[in-house]
């Protein structure tokens, strides 16, 4: 248990660096404020005794006025100290949450793609946004309150026992029942708050998944099924929220009851002691104030601990994310290639997304500089996986991949990525101008070069029909077809002008005219570059220098189109079946 606590503190430590002094000042301010709060009733006791004694003779109004003025000054100082500690705690927590978000953003870039294969986008998004926000809000609302209330509770106890131990004992004993009840409730609340965060992540993930595939859901008439599934997830979220909020809701009433019970008990015991002459009326009045002061921090601590447990549940999920295994640190690696030619060699490559299942078994192939290499095969053959390995999105299990004779294991991922221009089947455009999308993360791109690339893929004319041309902002008001989006991503890849090019089914979702336009542009612009093309439509890669035919993670045939057709093997069957299908469609 001790090691676990140390581990938690170790996780928090880097996010609190530089905040120790402000937090220490806030703690000192909270202690001073607590002392002022408990010191005030002693002066009220003096005023009460002056008044009660003066009823028999004459009230010393000057003394009463002097004490009252002192109390006003004292409480003003207390207000200032309370504001100071609240401001410091709030500011420090915002710095803490900002650092946490920064750490998460940096962590995402260091995670292997395998993490995102195992976790839904909704779950990851929930950890980055909801969990951090929940932790920040809960800490902001409760941390300062719990600390201040704790100091006040200690100060009140010391003062009460110093004034009269019998009344102090009556006050403390009357609250033990409340503490016992609250302890039982708090023991159960942590699980409910953690379930709330997990269920919220599940709902977010499902909603994101269903909205992204809304057309498919509708076309398969799966709306009712989707509603039922969402209703189940939503009910789970409702139940966990209800339980956690119910617990939060009964905390304050329970503590108010304890406070009122203590108040009545102190009045009864105090009256009995006063009748016997053991205490003055002023002490009873002071204790009546102390009972309220004593029950208030108890209520605040109970409610604050509930919020802290909610923050703890959220922080657990955040630290789980930050504790995920990262990609290999490559800061020690130096740049390996200067004048890249573009020769790529796969040497007995083996890979599996999980240790139990190997996808690529013994992949060997050579792509000479400037060649157009096509990778074909049925769905699940491992075509896209080969591209992922080539881009070093995943680390291979066995064998090697060499670019110009250099093993990619010796190269930084950023160097490998710089070597490639890439066009994926799933286009990605962000909200920004067309210009920003085309020259994404590149410098020194002139307007002339950008326009030339747009013309090369046949998208320039469309761009110029838009109100602001290349400065048109791509948002919900601008509707682009699948083909237009794909042309923009191809133009972006051409502008990168890398020696290696990857086209992952780049023309499989566009019309015939657009496909021909893209194909001509790509044939012209792939000259002198080593290109890897993955396409289900074999008619688009007939002019490839080398065609690698894959099945079940292995190369079963290789050669150019004419050679493979002459062999009459798997490729020929695949090509002829597609050719027949095209004729039927026509």
Residue ranges with predicted function:
Residues 23-81, 161-166, 277-281:
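Transmembrane helix-loop-helix hairpins at lipid-water interfaces of multipass membrane proteins
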Residues 35, 74-93, 140, 144-151, ...:
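Alpha-helical transmembrane segments of multi-pass membrane proteins
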Residues 1-37, 52-67, 85-89, 93, ...:
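Membrane-integrated ABC transporters
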Residues 89, 93, 109-153:
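Juxtamembrane loop-to-helix connectors within ABC transporter transmembrane domains
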